């Protein structure tokens, strides 16, 4: 088999004899290409850097007079806008992880925002408020007029007014305690009588009542408030509007009345005449005349006539009471 001519040529070929063979020039060419690319990038950056100073110089000139607070305020406004837009986006998009919020969750979030801290700028003058607190001056609109002793002592009209007020208070208290309420239930001539009247404390009836009660005036406590019924539901039947059966009472009203009659105090003719006489004295207004007649020593005949008339009046009252009892 004849030898392959191509293989022979490869074996006989020497790369060093080739005119294009330059192993030292390859890294130089690669470095040249990288240098060209770096120069292009540096050129672009330098153009960008050179074009920026115009805008930067304008911004610096615009904010030359600013003290720095304006920038802080602008930053705060930007943050608030971001939080507001973020909250709107969260409400529209949903919760975390893309979950859809229900109406209840949104309502709860709105309620929480109502009680959230207020980040708005403060409008109150803190320095003026602090100075006012230190000076301890009264807040306008809360004046309290306190009467001083010097004014009351120097002004005679104030003394008169004070004395008049004290006199009025004493008369009011006297009027309140000068009246007494008489309430009694007694059994006379087979009938139960109930009386309730308001009379003067120094009247004959009041004195007789206090004497019968053992000089102990009745203590009237505060009236008890009636118990309120619970509100009726719209679904409950109206039982109260239904007619009640009278035959189911079984004479309870009569029993209660009989119990009161048993508890009533029984009066004889003398006690009833004494009560009627006290009422007559108060009605005719002869209390002072009786007091004068009792103190005088020279009117023996007048006293005898007066006692005779009184006895006749008592007999007439007792006779009428007996006739009323028989009927």
UniProtKB/Swiss-Prot annotation:
PROSITE patterns registered for this protein in UniProt: BCNT_C
Q: Which GO terms describe its biological process?
A: chromatin organization
Q: What is this protein called?
A: SWR1-complex protein 5
What is its biological role?
Component of the SWR1 complex which mediates the ATP-dependent exchange of histone H2A for the H2A variant HZT1 leading to transcriptional regulation of selected genes by chromatin remodeling. Involved in chromosome stability.
Could you tell me which InterPro entries the record lists for this protein?
BCNT-C, Swc5/CFDP1/2
Oligomeric state and interaction partners are given as: Component of the SWR1 chromatin remodeling complex.
- Tell me its family: Belongs to the SWC5 family.
Main localization is nucleus
Ranges of Acidic residues compositional bias? Answer: 1-23
Residues covered by the BCNT-C domain:
247-327
Organism's domain of life?
A: Eukaryota
Query: Which cellular components does GO assign to this protein?
Result: Swr1 complex
Q: Where is the composition biased (Basic and acidic residues)?
A: 106-115
Show the segment(s) annotated as Disordered.
1-122, 136-174, 210-230
Q: Which Pfam families match?
A: BCNT (PF07572)
Subcellular localization is given as: Nucleus
Q: Which UniProt keywords apply?
A: Activator, Chromatin regulator, Nucleus, Transcription, Transcription regulation
């Amino acid at each position: 088999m004849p030898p392959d001519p191509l293989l022979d040529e490869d074996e006989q070929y020497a790369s060093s004899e080739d005119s294009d063979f330059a192993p030292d020039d390859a890294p130089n060419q690669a470095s040249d290409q990288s240098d060209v690319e770096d120069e292009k990038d540096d050129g672009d950056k330098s153009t960008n850097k050179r074009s920026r100073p115009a805008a930067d110089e304008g911004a610096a000139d615009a904010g030359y007079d600013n003290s720095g607070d304006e920038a802080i305020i602008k930053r705060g406004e930007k943050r608030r806008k971001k939080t507001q837009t973020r909250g709107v986006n969260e409400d529209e998009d949903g919760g975390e992880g893309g979950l859809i919020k229900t109406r209840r969750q949104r309502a709860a979030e709105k309620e929480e925002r109502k009680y959230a801290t207020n980040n708005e700028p403060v409008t109150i003058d803190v320095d003026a408020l602090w100075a006012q607190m230190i000076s301890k001056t009264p807040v306008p609109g809360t004046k309290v007029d306190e009467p001083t002793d010097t004014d009351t002592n120097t002004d005679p009209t104030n003394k008169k007014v004070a004395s008049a007020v004290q006199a009025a208070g004493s008369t009011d208290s006297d009027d309140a305690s000068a009246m007494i309420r008489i309430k009694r239930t007694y059994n006379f001539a087979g009938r139960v009588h109930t009386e309730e009247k308001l009379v003067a404390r120094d009247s004959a009836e009041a004195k007789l009542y206090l004497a019968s009660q053992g000089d102990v005036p009745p203590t009237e406590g505060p009236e008890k408030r009636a118990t309120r019924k619970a509100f009726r539901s719209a679904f409950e039947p109206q039982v109260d509007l239904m007619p009640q059966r009278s035959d189911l009472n079984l004479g309870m009203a009569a029993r209660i009345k009989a119990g009161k009659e048993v508890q009533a105090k029984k009066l004889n003719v003398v006690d009833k005449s004494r009560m009627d006489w006290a009422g007559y004295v108060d009605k005719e207004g002869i209390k002072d005349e009786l007091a004068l007649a009792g103190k005088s020593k020279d009117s023996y005949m007048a006293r005898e006539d007066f006692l005779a008339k009184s006895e006749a009046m008592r007999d007439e009252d007792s006779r009428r009471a007996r006739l009323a009892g028989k009927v």
